[in-house]
Amino acid sequence: MPRPKTHDDALRVRLLDRAGELLSTEGPGALSLRRLAADVNTSTTAVYSLFGGKPALLDALYEEAFRRFGDRLAALPATDDPVEDIIRLGLVYRASALADPQFYLVMFSKVIPNFTPSAETDAAAADTFLPLVENVGRAVGCGMFVAAPHDQIALALWGVVHGLVSLELNGNLPPGVEIAPAYERAIRACADGWRRR
């Protein structure tokens, strides 16, 4: 009879969630394996058993952040309107950031000094940009957007979305400004700037 698994996927997810919280709220100095284990009510042995050490934990954290983000983007079914699909991707981008703010900083900043993800993890992270590029390609292909390099259009759209979400999560919005109404309009305005006239 095999021994029961004591360090399961649920514990792994709790450790990754807490590691992301520590990094995003207290910085890299707060993330020790001992503290992480204590915060999740487990042992450092469990952390080593699941991840092998801090470098692998950080890589797994980066991978998990992009996996969740990518899963949310991939869950959007395509419609026959690629521009509307782009708007919807932008809305999911914000929803994902608000659902997992502890991962947003891990994904899009240098919160972990001297961290370089593994080549496989980095490639998986880059794949999350593909739904936007693909929808831009559809919009260019059907004549809704001007003929321009797809990655340039996608970068401009991402910049709007990323900038507003970063301002919101970092608490840098002007007092009293409600982001939700401005957010979708900003994405639409950027998309309209690429429309074929």
Locate predicted features.
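Generic hydrophobic, amphipathic alpha-helix propensity
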Residues: 11-20, 36, 61-65, 69, ...
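Short secondary-structure transition hinges
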Residues: 95, 99-134, 173-176
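Helix-turn-helix
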Residues: 14, 18, 22-56, 60
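Amphipathic alpha-helical linker/stalk segments
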Residues: 63-88, 117-126, 135-137, 141
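Amphipathic C-terminal alpha-helical segment
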Residues: 96, 134, 138, 158-176, ...
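Hydrophobic alpha-helical connector segments
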Residues: 74-103, 153-157
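Amphipathic alpha-helical packing segments from all-alpha helical-bundle domains
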Residues: 116-142, 151-155, 180-184, 188, ...
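N-terminal intrinsically disordered/low-complexity leader segments
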Residues: 1-10
